[in-house]
């Protein structure tokens, strides 16, 4: 059985833990009460057998998060790029809770583009990985501001294509995310 994290312990490879209080507060700012936060496990391990999960790839196929090199003991205390990744992965928890077949769609996620345009569609009209990117990119925009968002865009973590002026971006995210989280 995998090691379960005790308070103030550093999680070892192969260990699992629940969300920290800080992480819950962070994700509640995005998903409100639409996720059962007490049941979300974070693994410091490969989801795939024989450690086949790429060391720099996070996976969330079953409502639980699997990190290898990108694991942090508390993502709420991490830098903005790791918080973006954490919110992206928590988006898959949210999608699964809404009934999306995350495992099935995830089988081909390495083939799909995470890039998107904000063209007036609702979030629900985008594919799975683009939904998660839009949610995480907007989180970065709202939390770290336009310049923090632009920094991650320069690193190709934020994957929006098109116009990048602050007022237009703000308006387009609001339009795409209207009614979110449902």
Name every feature range the model reports, one short phrase each.
Residues 33, 52, 65-87, 122-124:
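Short pre-active-site segment immediately N-terminal to the catalytic Zn-binding motif
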Residues 84-96:
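Active-site recognition of the HExxH zinc-binding catalytic motif
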Residues 1, 47-56, 60-61, 98-119:
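Alpha-helical membrane-targeting segments
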Residues 7, 19-28, 35, 100-182:
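Metalloprotease/metallohydrolase-associated module, dominated by Zn2+-dependent proteases
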Residues 1-13:
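Short, contiguous pre-domain boundary segments
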Residues 11-61:
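Auxiliary, metal-adjacent structural segments of Zn-dependent hydrolase domains
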Residues 45-49, 65, 71-73, 91, ...:
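Short, solvent-exposed loop/turn segments at secondary-structure junctions
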